[in-house]
From Swiss-Prot:
Belongs to the GTP cyclohydrolase I family. QueF type 2 subfamily. Substrate binds at V80, E81, S82, H231, E232. The gene is queF. The lineage of its organism: Bacteria, Pseudomonadati, Pseudomonadota, Gammaproteobacteria, Moraxellales. This is NADPH-dependent 7-cyano-7-deazaguanine reductase. The keyword Ribosomal protein does not apply. It is found in: Cytoplasm. Homodimer. The active site is at C191 (thioimide intermediate), D198 (proton donor). NADPH binds at S82, K83, R260, G261. It catalyses: 7-aminomethyl-7-carbaguanine + 2 NADP(+) = 7-cyano-7-deazaguanine + 2 NADPH + 3 H(+). Transmembrane segments: none annotated. It holds the Pfam family QueF. GO terms for biological process: queuosine biosynthetic process; tRNA modification.
Length: 285
């Protein structure tokens, strides 16, 4: 099945009636075959989708609005193509529902069927101050200035380059594993369907006997700038590369991508489910 499918190849018709058939699944195996690593180690975590343009009608025909968060397990065989999700949510705009809970149940059923796994759906009232959708800050230090003192120009690369992680480093190891927590706001890749740029913030927490070189890590993150890959695939590529180079005892990799079409996507992969953080939202979302 082509990742383009019927999306992006012709003028889009926006449905005005409930249309679950617009949801378009994409096999995770497509991206994982490219990574060429152990699939089972990429299946621990979640993809959190946050939708800010959800609306439906109550029984009086009055528009209702809410913010939604969808939790798709990394073990699901499929992801959902983001534009198809937007079309699906739009199709609910003029459908009557008796309660918010009914909408929540319906969306969970349709998304679960699409990705062939149980999807957790939360709907938040706009007046709920404790929704977990307030602006947060990544943990750790920001490494975006790690190359500020370097005179070397960072070249553009067509594909991610994990060899940058070991550039000009020694084989010295730390006697006891140390935890490094850091983030960068400079993650960029391209959507493989539309070729549009996807910007995001990447955060990593890693416990390893190998020290993290912030400058090399930044070079590695910048090597994604012209890479064509879905959000989930990019995070899994980073998780696989860091796992193979650092051989960590614990690893968490997550990204918060900026919103498009009212939806942002936030994948997270962990070496153990106990390391899974809570979903959150950053300032660019």
């Amino acid at each position: 099945m082509s990742i383009h499918g019927i999306l992006g190849e012709q003028t889009t018709d926006y449905p005005t009636e409930y249309s679950p058939e617009t949801l378009y699944p994409i096999a995770r195996s497509m991206g994982r075959e490219v990574i060429g690593w152990q699939d089972d180690k990429l299946e621990v975590g979640f993809d959190w989708w946050q939708a800010f343009e959800l609306s439906w009608l109550n029984e009086q025909g009055i528009s209702q609005v809410a913010i939604a968060r969808f939790g798709i397990p990394a073990s699901s065989p499929f992801i959902v193509e983001s534009k198809s999700l937007k079309l699906y949510l739009n199709s609910i705009n003029f459908t009557e529902f008796g309660s918010l809970e009914t909408v929540q149940t319906l969306i969970a059923k349709d998304l679960s069927k699409c990705v062939q796994a149980e999807v957790n759906v939360e709907l938040f009232d706009l007046e709920d101050e404790h929704s977990g959708l307030l602006i947060a800050q990544p943990d750790g230090i920001c490494i975006d200035d790690a190359l500020a003192d370097s005179t070397e120009k960072v070249a553009l690369t067509l594909h991610p380059d994990a060899s940058l992680l070991e550039r000009n480093t020694s084989d010295a190891k730390i006697s006891e594993g140390k935890t490094f927590s850091f983030y960068s706001n400079l993650l960029r890749s391209n959507c493989p369907v539309t070729n549009q740029p996807d910007w995001g913030t990447l955060a990593v927490s890693i416990t390893s006997n190998k020290p993290v070189n912030n400058a090399n890590m930044l070079r590695y993150i910048l090597s994604f700038r012209q890479h064509n890959g879905f959000h989930e695939q990019c995070v899994e590529q980073i998780f696989a590369d860091l796992s193979q180079y650092y051989e960590p005892s614990e690893l968490m990799v997550r990204a918060w991508y900026t919103r498009r079409g009212g939806i942002d996507i936030n994948p997270c992969r962990v070496s153990d489910i106990a390391l899974l953080p809570v979903p959150s939202r950053l300032i660019r979302q």
